Amino acid sequence: MAAPVMTVSDSKDLRGLNLIAAHSHIRGLGVDATTLEPRASSQGLVGQEKARKAAAVMLQMIKEGKIAGRAVLIAGPPSTGKTAIAMGMAQSLGPDVPFTTLASSEIFSLEMSKTEALTQAFRKSIGVRIKEESEIMEGEVVEIQIDRSVTGSAKQGKLTIKTTDMEAVYDMGSKMIDAMTKERVMAGDIISIDKSSGKITKLGRSYARSRDYDAMGVDTKFLQCPDGELQKRKEVVHTVTLHEIDVINSRTQGFLALFSGDTGEIRSEIRDQINTKVGEWKEEGKAEIVPGVLFIDEVHMLDIECFSYINRALEDDLAPVVIMASNRGNSRIRGTDYRSPHGLPLDFLDRVAIINTHSYTPEEIKQIISIRAQEEEVDVHPDALALLTKIGQEAGLRYASNLITTSQLVSAKRKAKQVEVSDVQRSFQLFYDPARSIKFVAESEKRLIGNTGAVDFSVGAAVSNGEEKMDLS
């Protein structure tokens, strides 16, 4: 009898949607929870202690809801971790506080005005925590009886459900029977039924029925039988943004516009009505305003009209904390001939709290590259790590980070498990850094097409032996 053929798949598991991005290694700001003192290297962030401490103070005030309508500027040279600090703040805020990221160039669109794009970004960054009381039934299913008529008319049934204190029998209609069948509810399950919507949630199985089957799935959860009354009132908290409420109330298709992305321009009258309604909910204690964070990267790309709008928007009652990043020095404000620090108007710069970042030390660059290598699952030899650190100092941290993956591909070509110095050198020769690219452009300027569109093909046509003219013989 022939042995069965064994097949081995050597394909790697895909990471799904969790792809490796530039800041995917950042888990938080890396500060002590009580003293807010920054650690040397923690949660993916290295160095920049003063900037991280300042960001942590802002973060603490945002969490406590003490500040809103403030503007913070993170300013520093390129590759000094400005966006990384903002991403660390986003990770530390948690899921309940809205955090919106916006690149300055995103607001310049033919479909939507600049002020509308900024308004939507501001309203995405303001959360509304709505409290709602719902009546639920929670207990252990004792028995389910379903009567199916011979004629095929509507099904009827009875549900017996109990807690440790009481037991009750309820009549079920066809919709409830279908929901029970869909959730595969059986005797011994502990379920929760929302009376207002009829939603059935299967919480787990009772400990009393744990020996009913010899084998169970890994997702089977055993719980104690609930005690007290069968019917209870439970407070449910939903957190939505003002922009989501705007979209639902402004479009004929309602909440479907949230998924299609076709929000378009939203009229100011609708926003005013929503603001009034949210204010009423707040006074009645039904809702709570959660001021979030709007992060605008490359803020110097905004024009003077946008700065004027942000100036006014920060004075509004419903305004988030605006965090901006800029790597410019004295530069021209877009839309004017004026020059200003960081490319921001002086009257706007007056309102801004500025956090400075400085260049990384060689040791900090080494730690960052090591963290990136771990995130990308690349084993780097210590000598290769030292070379990447040197490249990071001279050519820039981004370029050195990009060389990690390319060096790993070069090492995989020779079936090596560790990235060596030769692999980094090979990648360095294949891919130019900005300095070498500038040098190449300067040397080949006449061969490249200039502003006028002219190019001189005669230059550089000489062969390598030093002849001035091309020899075709």
UniProtKB/Swiss-Prot annotation:
ATP binds at residues 76-83. This is RuvB-like helicase 2. Disulfide bonds: none annotated. The keyword Transmembrane does not apply. Its main location: nucleus. Keywords: Activator, ATP-binding, Chromatin regulator, DNA damage, DNA repair, Helicase, Hydrolase, Nucleotide-binding, Nucleus, rRNA processing, Transcription, Transcription regulation. DNA helicase which participates in several chromatin remodeling complexes, including the SWR1 and the INO80 complexes. The SWR1 complex mediates the ATP-dependent exchange of histone H2A for the H2A variant HZT1 leading to transcriptional regulation of selected genes by chromatin remodeling. The INO80 complex remodels chromatin by shifting nucleosomes and is involved in DNA repair. Also involved in pre-rRNA processing. Belongs to the RuvB family. PANTHER family: RUVB-RELATED REPTIN AND PONTIN. The gene is RVB2. It is found in: Nucleus. GO terms for cellular component: nucleus. May form heterododecamers with RVB1. Component of the SWR1 chromatin remodeling complex, the INO80 chromatin remodeling complex, and of the R2TP complex. One of its GO terms (molecular function) is ATP hydrolysis activity. It comes from Gibberella zeae (strain ATCC MYA-4620 / CBS 123657 / FGSC 9075 / NRRL 31084 / PH-1) (Wheat head blight fungus). InterPro entries: AAA+_ATPase (IPR003593), P-loop_NTPase (IPR027417), RuvB-like (IPR027238), RuvB-like_C (IPR041048), RuvBL1/2_DNA/RNA_bd_dom (IPR042487), TIP49_P-loop (IPR010339).
